[in-house]
Amino acid sequence: MTAVTLAHNTMHSDRLSRRSAVVVFLAFALAYFFSALVRAITATLSPTLTDEFSLNAQDLGLLAGGYFLGFSFTQLPLGRLLDSHGPKKVVLAFLTFAVLGCLAFAWADSFTGLLAARVLCGMGVSACLMAPLTGYRRWFDANDQLRSNSWMLMTGSLGMLAATLPVQWLMPIWGWRALFVMLGIMIALAMVLIFMVVPLWRTTSTNEDPAAKVIQDDGSYREIWRSAYFWRMTPIGFFSYGGMVAIQTLWAGPWMTQVAGWTPTEAAKGLFLINLCMLVTFWLWGLMSPGLARRGIPVERLIAWGLPMSFVVIASLAWMGPSIGTGAAVGVALLCVSSTVVALAQPAVGMAFPPHLAGRALSAYNLVVFAGIFVVQWGIGLMVDAGLGMGLQKPAAYQMALACFGVCSGLSWVYFLLKRPIQA
């Protein structure tokens, strides 16, 4: 039995009509769009922030990773809150901190201020994906859950797309500080829409959820931590999924400028291409996932077959280094696109547990992913600085860091293959 088939435990009485489901999806998608824009904007702003605050590679990695550090801090309490109070109340409360974080970043006058604001932003938007996925677990059927997950990620890619050339174009007009003020305003508007259209959470649902009758839910993560399926998915979530996002949202830009020799404007165009490719890829996953499930092709098999393509691309990029030249954006795009199959692990983990545990299961796995993003983002920066300290040229230091990341990702895939696939 795969994780997808376990989704039939969903509470049918809570299903939304098609029209209501679309409206709710769009409201959550708007908030997630802005959260992804906030996440990815440091890749475009990295040359400006590096010059203005005299940042090195380690500082830049820590600054970008601060978002994910703040995100990780909230995941375990977030899961309990989602299961208890529902997506609407939780996401509105959390987004208040995101607005404050954007304003704090706009007025920061030191690296410490920037880092604190990024952590606050990360904490604030940390419910923007988990809240809707928890709601979809109850409101949508199994096929729509797979599709909506992919299309939420597509919306995130659209936000990352907006963080590239559009931000580059607005920089000479507004400056980066005004951009963050505007982001805070737009997130507040998304909060208003969520307040208006997202349904409240029904807490008295044990009549519809057979699992809730026999399990005395104490709000703990005990069932999650005991799940062999969860632990099977953990290393690939940490290294491959986390690494994909770390590269997409930070190190893609420096790879193009520091390794391939591109200008900041050329790198912004490259980031636009990368995120456009990611957007199209997640849209296609949303179209294909229900059909693949109906054909009996489980998520686990897709990951086992598909993820090795990313290792080939990582090895090629690390080997070619500066010689990739004008093909740098295409190479990084291939790396990110070939890694997207691992994103299917997240809804699979959520559907491997009964609905009353969905918020905790999804948040626990999201903690794994975002801890991976933080570690990979900062770790690559540390490796680059270590390589420079060893006397390597900057491109060679980046090549060494990417190769180390590739080895870690490959080992996580081997663990996934060898771990006995016991379901929750």
Where do the PLM segments sit?
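Cytoplasmic helix-loop-helix junction between adjacent transmembrane helices
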Residues: 117-156
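Extracytoplasmic
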Residues: 23-57, 247-253, 376-380
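Paired small-residue
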Residues: 97, 101, 112-120, 326-334
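Juxtamembrane intracellular "pre-TM" segments in multi-pass secondary transporters
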Residues: 8-17, 201-234
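Conserved MFS/SLC helix-loop-helix module at the cytosolic interface between two early adjacent transmembrane helices
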Residues: 73-112
